[in-house]
């Protein structure tokens, strides 16, 4: 199995002036390819230190990926450090030169020697095209001194590194791995990591050889990543699908997707399948729920529109919420959330509406209504003449203003998903 190390170059990383997001991104991408990362190192711009770090890394790992220090400025010394380490020279890469010329001429500038130097690569390397910038990347076989191990050099600009990894480095890694790796996320909402682990313990106790399960909690829920590595693709796919399927059955009430689908995409599919249309009324989330829904292409087919009603006056004028209700219960209450959802339903023409009202913080709290309190309302048209179905709930979050708004929006989407799941199950 191929093992990797990541080396991030730059004094700015060691001084805390910049967060090393490149290393995290590369490690995640390699993990998905079944290549474990043994070590991540940050190194200064000094050539002597780079040579030492590169030499040690190549002594441990078959693949060393380096970001940073390939630009045209004086502190970009990575290429020189590699030249000295491997005792090689530079050569001009025609393909990289064309990329540089296209970018320079497109900006109406003249080609300079400094710009031309960005297309110089270490002798014997495979040049990596830079489709987002000018500095060429490269993949080098480091020769018998380092047991034919490989060094990958990429710029430190995240968008340039990302393009090189996806376009050249990862395909190159796949060609040499000799195995197939399959990843399937089982996405859940409304259940904690520990509870979820208890639910699927029987699956984890009987995993096929080469299959692992990882829990990935985040602000929106917990993803269970099922990973399978095998020499034969057919076996990898079969084992992976079997485990992902077993997990989704055991945790069915919390699973909203198996595979790379978002909660928003799942909800929109459910709305289409049940021939429903959606409208949203928001106070504390300030349009975030509607923004998340409309981030999905094709949402216009089921999303009719929304109301951002931050003040009490807006709630009264736009949604018809009673001033007496607001006075009696306050804006952050189940009663007002229900009235907001009903008003949204009636004034939008949609068949289902959700509403949010809460206290994101840091101010606005009262003794009985703390920061993080959220009231949700949902109204839905029903067949016959009995009027809309209305429900509400209260939740409490713990976070700063930004975190609370995100969690409020997630709670609203969860309420909508649960309502659609119930109606979908009853119609089967």
Curated annotation (Swiss-Prot):
Gene3D superfamilies: CinA-like, MoaB/Mog-like domain. InterPro entries: CinA, CinA-like_C, CinA_C, CinA_KH, Competence-induced_CinA, MoaB/Mog-like_dom_sf, MoaB/Mog_dom. SMART domains: MoCF_biosynth. Belongs to the CinA family. NCBIfam families: cinA_nterm, PncC_domain. This is CinA-like protein. It comes from Chlorobium phaeovibrioides (strain DSM 265 / 1930) (Prosthecochloris vibrioformis (strain DSM 265)).
């Amino acid at each position: 199995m191929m093992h990797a190390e990541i080396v991030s170059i730059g004094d700015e990383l060691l001084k805390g002036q910049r967060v090393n997001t490149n290393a995290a991104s590369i490690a995640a991408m390699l993990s998905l390819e079944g290549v474990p990362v043994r070590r991540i190192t940050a190194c200064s711009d000094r050539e002597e230190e780079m040579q030492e770090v590169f030499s040690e890394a190549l002594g441990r790992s078959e693949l060393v990926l380096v970001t940073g220090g390939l630009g045209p400025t004086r502190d970009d010394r990575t290429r020189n450090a590699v030249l000295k380490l491997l005792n090689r020279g530079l050569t001009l890469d025609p393909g990289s030169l064309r990329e540089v010329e296209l970018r320079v001429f497109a900006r109406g500038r003249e080609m300079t020697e400094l710009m031309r130097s960005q297309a110089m690569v270490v002798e014997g390397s495979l040049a990596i095209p830079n489709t987002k910038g000018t500095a060429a990347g490269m993949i080098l076989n480091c020769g018998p001194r380092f047991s034919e191990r490989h060094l990958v050099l990429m710029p430190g600009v995240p968008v340039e590194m990302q393009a090189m990894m996806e376009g050249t480095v990862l395909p190159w890694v796949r060609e040499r791995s000799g195995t197939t790796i399959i990843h399937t996320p089982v996405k859940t909402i409304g259940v904690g990591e520990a509870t979820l682990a208890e639910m699927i313990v029987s699956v984890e106790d009987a995993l096929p050889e080469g299959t692992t399960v990882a829990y990935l909690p985040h602000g929106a829920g917990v993803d269970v990543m099922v990973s399978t590595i095998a020499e034969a693709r057919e076996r990898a796919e079969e084992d992976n699908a079997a485990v992902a399927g077993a997990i989704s059955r055991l945790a069915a009430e919390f699973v909203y997707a198996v595979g790379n689908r978002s909660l928003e995409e799942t909800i929109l599919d459910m709305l289409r399948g049940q021939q429903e249309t959606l409208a949203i009324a928001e106070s504390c989330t300030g349009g975030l729920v509607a923004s998340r829904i409309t981030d999905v292409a094709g949402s216009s087919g089921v999303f009719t529109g929304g109301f951002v009603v931050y003040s009490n006056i807006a709630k009264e004028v736009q949604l018809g919420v009673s001033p007496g209700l607001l006075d009696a219960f306050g804006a952050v209450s189940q009663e007002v959330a229900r009235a907001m959802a009903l008003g949204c339903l009636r004034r939008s023409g949609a068949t289902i509406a959700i509403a949010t009202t809460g206290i994101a913080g840091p101010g606005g709290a009262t003794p009985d209504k703390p920061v993080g309190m959220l009231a949700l309302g949902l109204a839905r048209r029903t067949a016959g003449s009995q009027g809309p179905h209305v429900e509400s709930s209260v939740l409490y979050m713990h976070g700063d203003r930004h975190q609370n708004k995100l969690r409020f929006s997630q709670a609203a989407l969860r309420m909508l998903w649960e309502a659609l799941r119930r109606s979908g199950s009853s119609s089967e």
